[in-house]
Amino acid sequence: MKNNNIDYSDYYARGGKIDKSIPLKIRKEIYDSEGERRIDERAIEVLTEYAENLPQTKELNTSKKTGDYYPERKKLHEKIMDTFKEDLICIQNDEPIAILMGGSPASGKSTFLRKYAPYLLKEEILKVDADEIRAKLPEYKGWNATQTHQETKDIVNTLLSDRTIGIPCKYDIIYDGTMNSTKSYYPLIALLKKLGYKVFIVYIDKVDEEVVKKRALERYKKSGRFVPMAVIDDFFTRGKSALNELKDKADGYMVVDGSGGDYKVIERGGMRLPKRRAYSKLGVPIVELEKQSKMESGGITQNSTPDYLQMFLGK
């Protein structure tokens, strides 16, 4: 029989131990007596305020004098980015494609992709997802996405810049964003088109704000991954103005009804996003290209370079 006199808020939460780096006063507000994460209005308010007042990880890991990340942190960023690139396929036999996802947090973007075009979730394509990136930062604990926001954004911006795209080859890209502003999308689309990409927009629509909030809170209760309610509020306040501006800039777009489980396409224009992509026939693994480049720099002759790699190496 459970001892109801014991305060379990300092013991275990579902999915792991309670984070004891959080002050006890705060823990008592955000966990119940059994160590479960609370998702009532008061608990979420306390958690949000606490997380928002923590120093940004960017601030903690950059030089006050230069504003640059410390060398060790730069190495971490490189390592994080490399993990998303190690299984990419260099596109040789077709045009590379880029998919720009839009829609609110917890709108079901991954669920739609799994149903419509599962290849978009494979490791052969560069997936740029802020949540997956911040999860690799050592300070990230699920509930403190706000604290990692600026640093995560810097890594995302690097992955979506000419410092990464097209180097050392062109590979397919999917960017999982909200598309609540055009600011970062205009230069990205311009860069992609300059490099010869076909650009597609996929936007998940028709998901009620209260449904999104409920999903986000239930996900936090189960996994500890927290999305501040203000982020969701901001998305719905802005509406689809960015989508309406950007969709004509893409080679093709689709708007999907995410209110049910069938994910029907309710609007589309331009080219159709391929439902299948056979990467084994489209090119070569990026690791082979990088290995060959190292061999070239080591003095291996052109005649020893396989024909299928010579085009990438400018032979």
For the regions a protein language model found, what residue spans apply to each?
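Conserved glycine(s) of the Walker
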Residues: 108-109
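Hydrophobic positions on the alpha1 helix immediately C-terminal to the Walker A/P-loop
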Residues: 112
